[in-house]
Every structure is written in C-alpha cells, then in structure tokens.
Amino acid sequence: MLKAIILIGGPEKGTRFRPLSLDTPKPLFPIAGKPVIQHHVEACVRIKELKEILILGFYPSSQMQQFVSNMQNLYDVNIRYLQEFTSLGTAGGMYHFRDQIRSGNPSAFFVLNGDVCADFPLPQLYDFHVSKGEKALVSIMGTEATRQQAVHYGCMVLGKNEEVTHYVEKPRSYVSTLINCGVYVCSIELFSRMGTVFHSKQLDYNSLNNGNGKDLGHIQLEQEILTPLAGTGMMFGLPVSKWWSQIKTAGSAIYGNRHYLALYKNTHPERLANAGLKASEHSNGSLVCNIIPDVHIHPTASVHPTATLGPNVSIGPGVVIGPGVRIRESIILENAVIKDHTLVLHSIVGRSSQIGMWARVEGTPSDPDPNKPFAKMENPPLFNNDGRLNPSITILGYSVSVPSEMILLNSIVLPHKELSRSFKNEIIL
C-alpha cells in the first residue's frame, strides 16, 4: 500500500502569484481547466497501489472543502485535507501528522510540492526507489537546468548507483546543474530523521538558543533532512527528461497551461476542443468557432462561431466570447465576458471580468530561452533595477471592467477596477 502527500503551503505564500491568488487559493487556480493540484491528484491515482492522498497546508479548511469533496467523487481514492495550525515548513507538517500518514502501514509515500507542474513520472520514480532496496530513505526526481539558473533551486550531485553524494538548497555558487523537482518517494523510516531534528530543536529552545521566532515544529525538508542525508547512501536521485516547471508567478501559469494542454492529447483527449466539433452547448450545432490546437473550452462556456481560439487557450465555466474575438496563449477564467472583435494575447482574464468591443489586451511571455538547452522559466521580480515594471503577461484581477477600444499592454489590474483609459507597463491599484 502507498500514500501520497501534496504540500500546498498557505495564504502568506504565493504572494508573487497575486492578484490571481487574492480570490482563489494558488493551489486551486485553474490551469488547463483544472485546479493546479488536481493534476497532482490525477498523477497519483494512476498508481494502483496508492490508497490515500493527504493534502497538507494551512489554508482554512473551508477553502479546501469543496475541492476535496469533488476529488472524492471523481476518483476511487481516499482524499483528505489536513490543516496545519501554523506554517510548519516542508517537513514540519508531515511530522506533525505522522500518525495519519503511517496509519494502515504504507510501504512508502510520495511527496509532491503543490507549486510545481509536470508530466509526473510517479510509477518510474517508485520503481527506481524500490530498486535501491531497504537502505533507500528518499528518492528525488531531478531534472537538468542551466548553470546560471541552477543556483535558484536545490542542487544535487550524483555518485555511482545514482546515490546523492551532495545536496545544497539554493547554493550561493555553482554546485550542479541537476536540480530537485520537489517530487519524492520516501520510506516510513524517514520520520525517525524528522524526529531527531524536532528533538534537537526542543533542546535548543530549552537552552534559549531558539532565535528564529518560528514554531518548534517548523522543519524544512530540504535544508534539515535532505542536506544531512547526502553522502550517507540512503538518498538517491532519478534524473528525468520530461517537462517540469515551477509555478511561482502568474506568467508561469500560462507556460504550465500550454504544456498541460499538450499532455491532454495522450491523457485526456476529451478535454480538448477540436476543430470541426461543436465548441459549446450554447453554439449553433452547424457552426463552429475556429480552433487552433490546443484549446480547452468548458461545456458551459458560450463561444461565438466567428471567434478564433488558440493555440494554448483555456476557457473557463460560464465564459461568454463574442463575434470576431481572437484569443491566443491565454487563460480566461469563470464568468468572464469578452465582447466583439477583441484581441487577447498572453494574458489571464480574471473571474467575472468584462472586456469591451475592439479592445486589445496583450502581455509579454516569460518563456524559457529556447536557445539554451535545459533552460527553465525565468521568474523575474515585478520591477527592474531602475524601478520600472518588468514586461510580463497582462493580468486582470477579479471583476475588472475594460471599456471598448482600449489597449492594455504588459499591465496588472487589481480586482474590482473599472478602467477609463488605456494603460502600458503599469500596475493599476
């Protein structure tokens, strides 16, 4: 029997994802028409031996309740949300809920960070872990990055037999181009390691050496568990070449959307809208909107036959798209309205937002450099060294109104704004 743990953090995390995370928890933001962590759940349920999925975080239970209920109805696996009483780090939550994780005596458990998107090769990772025998405490999924980008991730050095001989989280200087993907298979014996760290923190606290102001149970998996395990012969790394990316900024959601839509061709072709088929239940059966693959259209969306969508577009529930609209490389969220002959490129249109006729909403993609092998998504800060806004995708927050014949370029609009003019390279507060 196996279990899986999905780590989702809490409300004070994911601030770079704002304004999209202001009204929707980041783990539940829809990418390719499904919440981010539903893609994790779907990867887990493909493993027959897996009987339970535990979602760990400190979002209020009320925000996760509906999602967990939906997943229970969709999949034949027990799914629960365990709420931490405070931020406990990437390993502290697992140690706090160790009894729930160990119940049923699972042989091992997966750990997936909730802020990554990937073509998760979980069966391959589990087989790799089993092949290393009982000595293996942790097996890490790794991928190649460029030399310059690797220092922004956890870096590991592999010795013979794929053993991790050295591990450093976000090193100051170059260590290795093989980075940690935030996807693990762990043996139950790992909890004894966590217990050792916890008890040493208790001793520090009792001797008044605890000066970080964090809870005693706050344990970082990467720094406090993985780094000491390196070189002990109990931690192994599996390099994979499949697609992987972090979801840190809103721009990475567009990038993730593109790749998940491409994966649907093999995993869920029914989720893709195909040219030549009826685009929505509200459209005339004999007329179809123009679709350039890959596109996901929710069944309740209304798309005019003269609209052109794609490539890499996701249309959410209740969306209304008018005549002559052109949308490319974008995510249109629930109940948004896009009126006649409007152009939307490299943008995310928030829930219940409205864009008038003949408007142009355009952003700048922040894709990996195609000329560099193994390049990952750049997650630049909002502002450059001159204090100017870095060009990025355009984001409309919840219930934003853009009037007709306006241009919105490389801008971020916070919720509930009614724009009265065009904007370029601005944050509209």
Region locations from a protein language model:
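Conserved N-terminal catalytic core of the sugar/cofactor nucleotidyltransferase
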Residues: 1-25, 29-124, 390, 398-399, ...
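Glycine-rich hexapeptide-repeat left-handed beta-helix
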Residues: 9, 323-429
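Short, hinge-like loop/turn segments at secondary-structure boundaries
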Residues: 70-73, 100, 128, 155-161
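Catalytic-core segments of class I nucleotidyltransferases/pyrophosphorylases
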Residues: 106-110, 117, 122-133, 145-150, ...
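Charged, glycine/proline-rich intrinsically disordered loops and linkers
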Residues: 200-216, 281, 367-381
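Long, charged amphipathic helices and adjacent flexible linkers at domain junctions
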Residues: 261-299
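C-terminal accessory/binding modules appended to enzymatic or scaffolding proteins
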Residues: 294-320, 324
